[in-house]
Amino acid sequence: MWVTRLLPVLLLQHVLLHLLLLPIAIPYAEGQKKRRNTLHEFKRSAKTTLIKEDPLLKIKTKKMNTADQCANRCIRNKGLPFTCKAFVFDKARKRCLWFPFNSMSSGVKKEFGHEFDLYENKDYIRNCIIGKGGSYKGTVSITKSGIKCQPWNSMIPHEHSFLPSSYRGKDLQENYCRNPRGEEGGPWCFTSNPEVRYEVCDIPQCSEVECMTCNGESYRGPMDHTETGKICQRWDHQTPHRHKFLPERYPDKGFDDNYCRNPDGKPRPWCYTLDPDTPWEYCAIKMCAHSTMNDTDLPMQTTECIQGQGEGYRGTINTIWNGIPCQRWDSQYPHQHDITPENFKCKDLRENYCRNPDGAESPWCFTTDPNIRVGYCSQIPKCDVSSGQDCYRGNGKNYMGSLSKTRSGLTCSMWDKNMEDLHRHIFWEPDATKLNKNYCRNPDDDAHGPWCYTGNPLIPWDYCPISRCEGDTTPTIVNLDHPVISCAKTKQLRVVNGIPTRTNVGWMVSLKYRNKHICGGSLIKESWILTARQCFPSRNKDLKDYEAWLGIHDVHGRGDEKRKQVLNVTQLVYGPEGSDLVLLKLARPAILDDFVSTIDLPNYGCTIPEKTTCSVYGWGYTGLINSDGLLRVAHLYIMGNEKCSQYHQGKVTLNESEICAGAENIVSGPCEGDYGGPLVCEQHKMRMVLGVIVPGRGCAIPNRPGIFVRVAYYAKWIHKIILTYKAPQL
């Protein structure tokens, strides 16, 4: 017996009303389409419009401010006398043109138009289905067994109730296969055979159609949802998830619409999702039957030298730059990782050879030293260094070659369009006769070689991939007489045998990755941190998982809650080639107070006298099993490069970009966790960051002084970045 039969009528009405008013929890997968930005449902073709050759085809146009507004009206067919399948946004006139056709329709042709962007509803151009195929609106009209479909508005030979007027929005047009009720089996139709009432159509799943080679770095297909069915976020949008993978910043990564891609060396393609609680997920793309890469997809393979970033290096070097042996790729000791031969099948992760599977700056490996997780194999020479116009001498101020791309692959912009910016940071009139077209040049006497403007607001300028000519010994710093101090940050390196410090070190930064301390750093300006490149081995790293903690003494922030400042990192600027430096742009400026301050940079090219006592700071490995997590300081003295080389038994030759410091008697020095942190010296009552801690041979080894990046050598580059990188960074 039903309980409702026993209820008085008024009580029953009250219960029903209460049930109707209860909030309905819609699962994300079902509700996301209504909430998401409708532009995700369109495929964009830049600088393209559609021209109708059939005069009977209709067009609707109206002035609107954005493509998003055009998309909303197209999806809802609001105020349109037809079913909208595509639209064009006129960027110059801020006008929408809606079409009942698309580029696949007869009587229509594509045409180039610089001010136009064409957006086509994916449901009408997709030749595969997602899930049950409820959104499929393609033109297949034959069943799985080959029978022609019956038109939906016809009752011959089969009568039915699936009339187009009864299923608005389901596009029951012509005799195309559809799934208006979202039933199992996928799109179907009534057949033209009187003996067969209906049958499913043979339309494949998109996950079956799409395939990839290797790890999918070269995948450029239209998969736009994750393996759990979540719709991907457009790469040119910053909601619901902010990210750095902007199409204009990475023009070679194929960031079209919201399609799955693999820009950062993950095991397979992925995307950000429209679910606010799920930042990203992998996509379900199978391996191609013959999983071989085209010649155009393969990096140039070399065995004796590296080309570009060394992604094609297949040699047998198996130590990092300072001689520490590499850990085997198929081993999880001493360092656990997921960059295994199984996950990166095409990257030749054999033995313990140096490789670059993830698009880092150069080949690298995990090391066999438990205190040093990764290291670069920078001792591998570059390929094709010649003595002609492909290289430069000195600092490259006389380079007159025709290269017009930056080291990150961006095309250089014309010099004559950037003269105002150039005048802003140099104090003399540049030689305009040398500034040809958009060729790499060095008009400001940059110590680190030719460069160019890019036209990209996120990367205003960058160095060009040109090496110094072989055998060139021209010094890049002419005068080395000025007092110097440098500042830097490091990766997980810890000051061994240091003492706890409560002195004024408000410029010390703890860099966190997912709340775990990985490196130190120095606050050199309110919005800028100096640290080590080894803390960010991949240029394509997503920065949203990184934070900078300032004003703390305890690495976990215990007892520092009132003075602690936690800031997001929005941009990573790599230093000149071989510098091991990185500048981090903060999402907002740090607030300077009694606990947070900046530290000074040294003068460019300066030196500091030998035996000057300096200090290194860090939260890294301490030599103790149970670390207290407190900031430590170790006092070292400056040592001349020649003497430093002797302590290293002649195995290390220091150059003008390095500085050496060691402890007098006890075993003190930086270790993993301290990387990126500063070597701080005082001169003329001014404290400066003279060096940056980078990985070395071992950790606080007796009679083995530390080698630091010499900040004074890169001081002009640091000032140039701070002056020119003014645009908001994402």
UniProtKB/Swiss-Prot annotation:
GO cellular component, one term: extracellular space
Known glycosylation sites: N294, N568, N655
Domain Peptidase S1 per the UniProt entry, residue ranges: 495-723
Disulfide pairings: C70-C96, C74-C84, C128-C206, C149-C189, C177-C201, C211-C288, C232-C271, C260-C283, C305-C383, C326-C365, C354-C377, C391-C469, C412-C452, C440-C464, C487-C606, C519-C535, C614-C681, C644-C660, C671-C699
InterPro entries, per database record: Hepatocyte_GF, HGF/MST1, Kringle, Kringle-like, Kringle_CS, Kringle_sf, Pan_app, Peptidase_S1_PA
Signal peptide: 1-31
Molecular function GO labels: growth factor activity; signaling receptor binding
Domain Kringle: 128-206, 211-288, 305-383, 391-469
Alphabetical list of Gene3D superfamilies matching this protein: Hepatocyte Growth Factor, Plasminogen Kringle 4, Trypsin-like serine proteases
UniProt KW Lyase keyword: no
Transmembrane segments: none
SUPFAM superfamilies: Hairpin loop containing domain-like (SSF57414), Kringle-like (SSF57440), Trypsin-like serine proteases (SSF50494)
Keyword Thylakoid attached: no
Ranges for domain PAN: 37-123
Record key words, sorted: Disulfide bond, Glycoprotein, Growth factor, Kringle, Pyrrolidone carboxylic acid, Repeat, Serine protease homolog, Signal
UniProt subunit comment: Dimer of an alpha chain and a beta chain linked by a disulfide bond. Interacts with SRPX2; the interaction increases HGF mitogenic activity.
Similarity field: Belongs to the peptidase S1 family. Plasminogen subfamily.
Function, as annotated: Potent mitogen for mature parenchymal hepatocyte cells, seems to be a hepatotrophic factor, and acts as a growth factor for a broad spectrum of tissues and cell types. Activating ligand for the receptor tyrosine kinase MET by binding to it and promoting its dimerization. Activates MAPK signaling following TMPRSS13 cleavage and activation.
Name of the molecule in the record: Hepatocyte growth factor
